[in-house]
Amino acid sequence: MSLLAVSYWLLPGPEAQALLEQLSALACEGIREAGGVCRLPPHVTLYSDHLKDDDPDSQEQAIDRLHQLADRRRPVQLCPKAFEASALLTQSLVMRFNAEARVELLPWLTQLCTSSRVELGYRLDPHLSLLYSEAPLEQRQKLAKQIPLPEDPLLFERVSAVIHPSTITNLADIAACTTIFECELFSPR
């Protein structure tokens, strides 16, 4: 079994990224004293797959898949619906999007699944993590109610391939996420 995985992330454009980083910093201020906290660049995970440890071309294949995705997809706007906290470390404090986000991103998932050698049963759940925290759930739920929700849709213009441990169990696993490639989505001029 592979110890590493590759995830494909949808990344915000500069304006949305600045706003999301401000919200993430605000969330971190509100929870830092209650437990460990870790942040990653704002992103929506589109798909995750095993990275073949014994195949030296595995990362190159992931980058090729990313290029294929970027060449066939255009920038997309997603509408924030709510902030919520869960017991899962990987969804400590997240921004949920409206129902149209799943419909909009399903073809992206299908494209990535089709080019995968192994079907992992990945379930698309469009959300954006503001932070990852070991703080008590009740405190994170309280914080989710205090953060101002953006009123306007957020524009996502880039995608990236990120390697990380195949199982995320602690903040060190989150911090180990490493971008191997990033590119702009197709945008006809």
Located regions from the model:
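Basic, often amphipathic N-terminal segments
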Residues: 1-78, 99-160, 170-189
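Substrate/cofactor-recognition hotspot
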Residues: 81
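A short acidic, often aromatic-flanked loop/helix-cap motif at beta-alpha or helix-coil junctions
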Residues: 85-86, 169
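Short, basic/glycine-rich phosphate-binding loops at helix/coil junctions
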Residues: 86-94
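Active-site/acyl-donor-binding loops of N-acyltransferases
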Residues: 162-165
